[in-house]
């Protein structure tokens, strides 16, 4: 439906559509949002959102023109100057920049924590800075990009209950599920209010679309959709159609990527030149990480981190030697992609912070595609030799 505007049957119908769209009145039972203008909604977007909600087991979904527009609109819908956001580290470089630069500039404070941080430590830091009453959002990315470290989603209910009990206010818990969802992890089941995605990645899987999505209950999605209307960040009709088509093969693609990833992890862990392999479910990630994996993940997914030596030179040498695997950012596509997070996707994160949260100069991030795994292993083998 490549159109900018829609014809009303009557003037009364047009009036009613606008009343609902601008929040002057709520939808009645069995009433649907009317088609007005493609900045507000369009059939392709509505079909996509309905399917995304089914995949996530949520009431509603909101589709966006990019993953960052989904994340930033969600944060802006729920945060105002004086509020505090708690967020897990590491997180996607764009998210890190938005939190630590844009939100900071408008007066939203932030407290970061990593996978080793206990809830009590987070609480003590908040209390020491007198910020517990100001926390309005908990933002978690798990597995973390690019280290694959897992954040225990049980922290969501614990923190929400503690703040509700002491300060009698609700916080919004948001989980970036791009790495594992919607097949291999279900954050809503652990108390998350909203789940966000860069739909560019696994959801689309063809490296030909930029898109984002947020899923949750009707009440939690409503302020996000309202703000989306005025920011103009909704997904375009043709992009929505492409993404809807891609969802038809989602399970086939992701399951094949997972099978390939497990074969590659097995190869890398046994290769004498590979120092570390980071993949959810590996015992080498530590018992605590293994326990979290077993409690909330259905699979380790198709993202792998590994190091040869802790140097940029060693990482660049391997990346420049790859023949089949493409040297490019992004992830979750049919083709395998490899990149250097320290100098590329996470270049904006201060060097000291990168090292503290496990993003070393030698770390390579590999997004595994649907190629024959023997071909991928052969490519990695020749690049390592």
Locate each region found by the language model:
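Short amphipathic alpha-helical segments
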Residues: 33, 59, 210, 239, ...
């Amino acid at each position: 439906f490549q159109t900018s505007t829609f014809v009303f049957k009557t003037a009364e119908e047009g009036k009613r559509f606008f009343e609902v769209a601008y929040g002057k009145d709520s939808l009645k039972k069995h009433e649907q949002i009317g088609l007005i203008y493609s900045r507000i909604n369009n059939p392709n977007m509505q079909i996509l959102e309905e399917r995304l909600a089914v995949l996530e087991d949520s009431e509603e979904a909101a589709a966006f023109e990019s993953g960052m527009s989904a994340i930033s609109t969600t944060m802006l819908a729920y945060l105002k100057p004086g509020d505090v956001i708690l967020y897990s580290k590491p997180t996607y470089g764009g998210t890190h920049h938005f939190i630590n630069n844009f939100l900071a500039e408008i007066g939203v404070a932030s407290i970061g924590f990593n996978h080793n941080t206990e809830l009590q430590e987070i609480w003590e830091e908040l209390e020491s800075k007198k910020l517990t009453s100001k926390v309005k959002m908990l933002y978690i990315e798990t597995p973390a990009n690019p280290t694959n470290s897992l954040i225990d989603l049980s922290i969501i209910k614990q923190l929400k209950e503690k703040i509700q009990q002491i300060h009698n206010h609700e916080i919004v818990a948001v989980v970036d599920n791009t790495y594992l969802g919607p097949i291999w992890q279900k954050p809503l089941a652990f108390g998350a209010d909203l789940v966000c995605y860069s739909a560019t990645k696994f959801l689309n899987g063809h490296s030909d679309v930029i898109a984002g999505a947020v899923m949750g209950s009707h009440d939690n999605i409503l302020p996000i959709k309202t703000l989306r209307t005025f920011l103009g960040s909704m997904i375009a009709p043709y992009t929505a159609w492409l993404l809807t088509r891609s969802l038809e093969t989602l399970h086939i693609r992701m399951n094949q990527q997972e099978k390939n990833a497990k074969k590659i992890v097995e190869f890398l862990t046994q290769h004498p030149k590979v120092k570390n392999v980071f993949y959810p479910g590996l015992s080498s990630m530590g018992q605590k990480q293994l326990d979290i994996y077993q409690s909330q993940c259905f699979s380790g997914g198709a993202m792998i981190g590994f190091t040869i030596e802790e140097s940029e030179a060693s990482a660049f040498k391997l990346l420049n030697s790859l023949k089949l695997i493409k040297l490019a950012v992004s992830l979750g596509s049919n083709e395998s992609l490899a990149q250097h997070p320290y100098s590329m996707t996470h270049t904006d994160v201060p060097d000291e912070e990168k090292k503290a949260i496990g993003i070393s100069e030698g770390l390579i991030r590999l997004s595994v595609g649907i190629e024959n795994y023997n071909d991928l292993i052969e490519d990695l083998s020749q690049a390592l030799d």
